[in-house]
């Protein structure tokens, strides 16, 4: 089953890029900014588990 989630967007409407795939401290911080406890780097963008609202840019 697919885990729900999404790519959060910054204030300019862009995804957060990342270089270190998988577990990524920067992405963890980004996801916590968006109110989600866990995230990782997938396809060079931060992806947040169970993050559904892609309109809540920070």
From Swiss-Prot:
Record keywords: Disulfide bond, Ion channel impairing toxin, Neurotoxin, Secreted, Toxin, Voltage-gated sodium channel impairing toxin
Disulfide-linked positions: 18-41, 27-46, 31-48
Presence of the UniProt keyword Disulfide bond in the record: yes
Residue span(s) of domain LCN-type CS-alpha/beta: 3-58
InterPro entries: LCN-type_CS_alpha_beta_dom (IPR044062), Scorpion_toxin-like_sf (IPR036574), Scorpion_toxinL/defensin (IPR002061)
Cross-referenced CDD domains: neurotoxins_LC_scorpion
Tissues in which the protein is found: Expressed by the venom gland.
Domain of life (superkingdom): Eukaryota
Main location as per UniProt: secreted
Gene Ontology molecular function: sodium channel inhibitor activity; toxin activity
Subcellular location: Secreted
Pfam family, one: Toxin_3
GO cellular component: extracellular region
Domain characteristics, as noted in the entry: Has the structural arrangement of an alpha-helix connected to antiparallel beta-sheets by disulfide bonds (CS-alpha/beta).
Family per similarity comment: Belongs to the long (3 C-C) scorpion toxin superfamily. Sodium channel inhibitor family. Beta subfamily.
The protein's name: Bestoxin
UniProt source species: Parabuthus transvaalicus
Taxonomic lineage of the native organism: Eukaryota, Metazoa, Ecdysozoa, Arthropoda, Chelicerata
């Amino acid at each position: 089953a697919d885990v729900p989630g999404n790519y959060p967007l910054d204030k300019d409407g862009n995804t957060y890029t990342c270089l270190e795939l998988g577990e990524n401290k920067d992405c963890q911080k980004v996801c916590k900014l968006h109110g989600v406890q866990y995230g990782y780097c997938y396809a060079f963008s931060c992806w947040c588990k169970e993050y559904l609202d892609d309109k809540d840019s920070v």
